[in-house]
Each structure stands twice: as C-alpha cells, then as structure tokens.
Swiss-Prot record:
Assembly behavior: Monomer.
Cell compartment(s), UniProt: Cytoplasm
Protein name, as recorded: Ribosomal RNA large subunit methyltransferase M
One Pfam family recorded for the sequence: RlmM_FDX
Species for this entry: Alcanivorax borkumensis (strain ATCC 700651 / DSM 11573 / NCIMB 13689 / SK2)
Active-site residues, Swiss-Prot/TrEMBL: K299
Function: Catalyzes the 2'-O-methylation at nucleotide C2498 in 23S rRNA.
Enzyme class, UniProt record, top EC level: transferase
Molecular function in Gene Ontology: methyltransferase activity
Cellular component GO terms held in the UniProt record: cytoplasm
EC identifiers of the protein: 2.1.1.186
Transferase as UniProt keyword: yes
Length: 353
C-alpha cells in the first residue's frame, strides 16, 4: 500500500477514457500542463482505458471542474494499493479514514473486457464496504468530495477523490435506455451530452430548433419529446411516427446550404463530414445569428486527434469572441460513451442553458 503519493510538490491524477484513446488523453493532459506551467508527465498504456498524470510541481486538479474532452472521469489520487489480500477493506481502511468523509462511493474499473469481468466482484465489495463507511460517518451526503476506488484488477488500483459538486457518472459510463419509439440509437448521444454538460437531459430551455442532416430523426426525436418544435432538414427519409406524433416538420434540403427564415433557439447537427467543414458551418449559424446555441458532433481525424480538435475549438472560440455583442462564448466538448470516432460539442452565447 502506498499512501504517500501526494505531498506539497506532487500530485497524481487518474483519468478514465475509452480504450484506444489513451494517447489522446495524455496529449490533452500535456497541453493543459504546459498551459498552466505544471511540471509532470503522463503514464499511459495502449487500450488500458485510463491514464495517470504525475505532477512533479504544481497541480492540474482544477481540470476536475473545467473537464477534459477525452476523460470520462478525473480524480485526484490519495494513494495506490498493490497486491492487497482478500481482506481489502482492512487494507484500505487507514487511507479511507485519512481521506474522508465522502458524499458517495464510486467503484470503478477499466472499460475493457478484463475490466468488465470485475463488475460482479465490485457489486459484492460495495455491499460490504458501503455500510461500514456509513456506520462510522465516512459516507454522508453533505460531504464535499466523492470517493473513487479504481481497480485495475481485483487486488490493485488507486484511491481517489473528486468534488461532489462536479456532475460525474460512476466510471464515466452512462448507460441509457433506448425507447422503442426512438428512430435511431443516435438519440442517446443527445441525452448523454445534456447530462454530461448540464447535469440533466431536461436542461434545455429552447422552444425552437433545427436539426441539420436529421434523417432518420434520432436527434429530432430527443428534442421534440421535450416539447421543442423542430425543423428536420434532410433529403433522406424521416421516421413516419416522428412526423405524425411529435412537433417535427420535415424540410427537404441540404444540411450545408439550407437557411432558416427566422432565428431559432438551437441548431443540432450530426453529419458524416470533415470536422473542419462541420465546425465552420456551426460557426456560421452562431455568428450570423441564425441560432442562439448549437449542439453538434465533430468526426475525429485519424492522427493527432486532440491537437486537431483543440485547434478547431479554438477557432470557434475566437470567431464567437468577435461577436461580443451577443455575449460571452460558452463551449463544452466531450468524447461521450455513445460517441465512437467523434466528439460532441455544445456552443452558445448564453449561460442560461
């Protein structure tokens, strides 16, 4: 057991990600470390599903609140445990006592085939640990930090914490149910994005929206089921039930050339195209005043995924900042659980969403 990972000069962060994106997450951590003049280095293994960041001087803990594109969760490590025996609670207890109290318990594992084999063990471990923590007051709802116990296997891992006020899902994996009436699985991306960015799938206060490249209508359905009137722009076929039962108007047109007659609250776009072209189009919708906010996907390049993505987001930020009469830009981006080779982006001029 190693409980002295942190001192006044050092810090270790544990970031979970989709397997295969460790290098992108490491590049993102390196970028923010350079930007904040924090000395340190990442430790990443391909397809492991997580990255460790070791700060030699300075801290990147502020990233827990601002978030990272490629990180599903981010916790500050309080200690590492290795080769602990079957009495895991006794082995971990001194560290838990020193780090507590906690608002909730997250038991996490890599999102890999091997990691998922730990789920049964972790369910049993929760039943044993959670009552013990509550009994001695180490687990109470009003605490300002949550506890992360990450197991790389059943005997090794890290103990970490994250601010309770930062909305996080255990393991960063938000498993959503797809209703039978949903036109496509892409509908889950919208729901996850709203929960990830705003803490609730019902956070939108929009009344009107445009869905560019809408067919068969997964994104339109997510908006319309919340009472938003949607213009669904696509030459393709929309789900008939969507048009019959929801406030959705099918507009035959091209996602990149169609223009609205009047301003809408929200434009959404999930098209398969070069990310630079998609971003430029969303930039136009926002800076021309056609929409107040945008939710869209950017397909990831094959190489330098973080660097290329960050450059595009910086370009969008600069363009929106030039329109300062519309307000301060708010841009959020994440590689969601239901994303694959893409990220989901929110951009607006208002903080009321």
């Amino acid at each position: 057991m190693h409980s002295d990972l942190l001192n006044s000069q050092s810090e270790t962060l544990l970031a979970l990600c989709r397997p295969g994106f460790e290098a992108d997450l490491a590049a993102e951590l390196n970028f923010h470390a350079a930007d904040q003049m924090v000395a340190g280095y990442p430790r990443a293994t391909a397809n492991s599903g997580y990255v460790l960041w070791h700060s030699q001087q300075g801290s990147l803990a502020s990233l827990q609140e601002s978030g990272l594109i490629f990180a599903r969760t981010l916790s500050v490590c309080e200690g590492e445990f290795s080769d602990i025996g079957d009495d895991r609670i006794s082995a971990l207890w001194p560290l838990l006592e020193a780090a507590g109290p906690f608002s909730e318990l997250y038991l996490e594992h890599p999102d890999t085939n091997e990691g998922r084999e730990l789920q049964r063990f972790l369910r049993g471990f929760r039943k044993a640990l959670e009552p013990r923590l509550k009994k001695v007051g180490l687990l109470r709802r009003q605490a300002k930090q949550r506890l992360h116990l990450f197991f790389s296997d059943s005997h090794n891992g890290w103990v970490g914490t994250s601010p309770s006020a930062v909305p996080l899902v255990e393991g960063g994996v938000l498993r959503l149910r797809l209703p039978a009436e949903a036109p496509s699985r892409s509908a889950l991306k919208v729901e996850e994005a709203l929960i990830r960015f705003f803490g609730s799938a019902d956070a939108l206060n929009a009344k009107t929206a445009v869905d560019l490249g809408a067919a068969p209508g997964g994104w339109s359905w997510q908006l319309a089921r919340r009472g938003i009137r949607v213009q669904a722009v696509d030459h393709g076929k929309m789900a008939p039930r969507l048009l019959d039962e929801y406030p959705v108007q099918h507009v035959y047109g091209d996602a990149f050339t169609w223009r609205p007659r009047s301003k809408v609250d929200l434009v959404v776009c999930d098209v398969v195209d070069k990310p630079a072209r998609t971003l430029q189009h969303m930039e136009k919708w926002l800076t021309q005043g056609w929409a107040t906010a945008a939710l869209f996907n950017l397909k990831l390049p094959m190489k330098r995924r973080f660097q290329e993505t960050w450059q595009l987001l910086e370009k969008l930020t600069a363009a929106m900042e030039r329109m300062d009469h519309l307000g301060e830009p708010v841009i959020k981006a994440a590689h969601l659980y239901y994303d694959r080779e893409e990220i989901t982006v929110w951009a607006s001029f208002h903080r009321s969403y």
